[in-house]
């Protein structure tokens, strides 16, 4: 059966929280709001589907009014092969399947300077959204943001490094308020985006939702998973991440999802899981690892609970093992030979 992971991260979830604020706007705090109170990003809902080594992110950014430019930064597990307009109602249909309709979509982040440059891998425009896929470490992405007129919230360096250590790929979605108004977009209108990512290591970013927030600020998000069988999760559901729905997806739901634009990859059968995030920002210090192989072994590294082991460090350590072994053996032989030569020492 095809292997599929779908994660509606209301995740990238509420967050992908406050990403970019132009210098004319205030830094992100509890979501992005302009210094004049006119700019706001609503809740973000994202569907991340994993099938045959390809991850599909379908996310939507909700226009909450205001002018200027503002946006969101999303950590990605790999380099996208395509970024295009997403299905018109897939995310709403998932919400409808598990709960009464609620506001979807999320907010943004804000960035500061560094002396590094991120590599731009892809640029495209979808409606009033300017999409840029970046490759670089935390300082690289921060520098790119400042070079493009955005600010960095105080916690951004730590959060960006948290993700860059696992995957140096980020997607910046910048909302042009004036362009949205010219297009006739109303407050609450969403722009769906479908991101296709070849990867062997899918995960759902959650910590990014707290970017720019105060420790006590609340994070409210929905995470949908669509897998072949009941998935293994790390961390397991807990007080601030409750399991709201876990059962086989109905044929009607899967048929509806496949009927939407760009959603033909949805399988004939799957397990539907819904997690609800209701947490203080300071307590959301992890991501969500999902094991879809049936081995019941989600990765602690993918969950952000362990640091990734770098090739350099492992290579150095491994290369030292034989050298140290030879040195130790030589020392033992030398001591033994010295003991034999010492006068007055009787051998057993």
Protein language model features and the residues they cover:
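Covalent nucleotidyltransferase core used to form phosphodiester bonds in nucleic acids
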Residues: 108-117, 121, 135-174
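Short hydrophobic-aromatic micro-motifs
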Residues: 56-58, 128-135
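A cross-kingdom signal targeting lumenal/periplasmic-facing segments of multi-pass membrane
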Residues: 80, 84-127, 135-141
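Bacterial N-terminal signal peptides that target proteins for export
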Residues: 1-9
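Surface-exposed, glycine/proline- and aromatic-rich loop segments on solvent-exposed faces
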Residues: 49-99, 145-164
């Amino acid at each position: 059966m095809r292997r599929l992971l779908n994660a509606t991260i209301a995740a990238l979830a509420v967050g992908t929280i406050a990403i970019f604020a132009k210098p004319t706007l205030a830094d992100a705090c509890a979501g992005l709001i302009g210094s004049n109170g006119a700019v706001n990003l609503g809740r973000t809902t994202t569907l991340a589907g994993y099938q045959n080594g390809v991850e599909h992110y379908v996310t939507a950014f909700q226009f909450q009014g205001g002018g200027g430019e503002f946006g969101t930064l999303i950590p990605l597990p790999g380099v996208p092969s395509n970024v295009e307009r997403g299905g018109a109602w897939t995310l709403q249909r998932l919400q409808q399947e598990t709960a009464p309709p609620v506001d979807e979509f999320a907010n943004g982040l804000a960035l500061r300077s560094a002396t590094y440059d991120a590599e731009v891998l892809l640029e495209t425009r979808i409606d009033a959204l300017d999409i840029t896929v970046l490759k670089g470490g935390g300082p690289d992405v921060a520098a790119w943001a400042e070079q493009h007129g955005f600010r960095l919230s105080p916690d951004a360096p730590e959060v960006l490094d948290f993700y860059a250590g696992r995957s140096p790929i980020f997607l910046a979605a910048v909302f042009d308020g004036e362009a949205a108004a010219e297009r006739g977009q109303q407050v609450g209108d969403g722009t769906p985006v479908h991101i296709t990512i070849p990867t062997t290591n899918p995960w759902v970013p959650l910590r990014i939702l707290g970017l720019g927030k105060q420790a006590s600020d609340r994070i409210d998000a929905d995470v949908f998973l669509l897998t072949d069988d009941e998935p293994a999760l790390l961390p397991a559901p807990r007080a601030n991440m409750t399991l709201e729905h876990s059962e086989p997806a109905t044929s009607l739901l899967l048929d509806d999802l496949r009927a939407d634009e760009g959603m033909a990859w949805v399988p004939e059968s799957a397990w539907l899981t819904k997690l609800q995030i209701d947490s203080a920002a300071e307590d959301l210090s992890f991501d969500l690892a999902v094991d879809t192989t049936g081995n019941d072994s989600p990765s602690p590294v993918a969950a952000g609970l362990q640091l990734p082991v770098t090739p350099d460090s492992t290579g150095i350590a491994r290369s030292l093992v034989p050298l140290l072994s030879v040195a130790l053996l030589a020392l033992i032989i030398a001591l033994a030979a010295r003991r034999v030569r010492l006068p007055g020492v009787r051998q057993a």
